[in-house]
UniProtKB/Swiss-Prot annotation:
Keywords: Disulfide bond, Ion channel impairing toxin, Knottin, Neurotoxin, Secreted, Signal, Toxin, Voltage-gated sodium channel impairing toxin. The presence of a 'disulfide through disulfide knot' structurally defines this protein as a knottin. Inhibits preferentially tetrodotoxin-insensitive sodium currents (Nav) on rat cardiac myocytes (IC(50) is 0.26 uM) and has weaker inhibition activity toward tetrodotoxin-sensitive sodium currents on rat dorsal root ganglion (DRG) sensory neurons (IC(50) is 0.83 uM) and on cockroach dorsal unpaired median (DUM) neurons (IC(50) is 1.19 uM). Has no significant effect on potassium currents on DRG neurons. Expressed by the venom gland. Residues 1-21 form the signal peptide. It comes from the Eukaryota. Pfam families: Toxin_12. Disulfide bonds join 33-47, 40-52, 46-59. One of its GO terms (molecular function) is ion channel inhibitor activity. It comes from Chilobrachys guangxiensis. This is U7-theraphotoxin-Cg1a. SUPFAM superfamilies: omega toxin-like. GO terms for cellular component: extracellular region. It is found in: Secreted.
Length: 63
């Protein structure tokens, strides 16, 4: 019984992670700007509320 519950919880977590990954991939192709953990450059700047960190060249959230 405990094993079944663990498998169900693991399965739900896996489905959630997969759906988040697919959603992030779709957002990346739809937008002309970078969102969280997107590579940033002069050609593709970060979206509003995100800033490009020069050391890592990724967009991160900034208030």
């Amino acid at each position: 019984m405990k094993t079944s519950i663990l498998f169900v919880i693991f399965g739900l977590a896996l489905l959630f992670a997969l759906s988040v990954a697919i959603e992030m991939e779709e957002e990346e192709t739809d937008r002309g700007c970078g969102t969280m953990w997107s590579p940033c450059s002069t050609e593709k700047p970060c979206c509003d509320n995100f800033s490009c960190q020069p050391a890592i060249k990724w967009c991160i959230w900034s208030p």
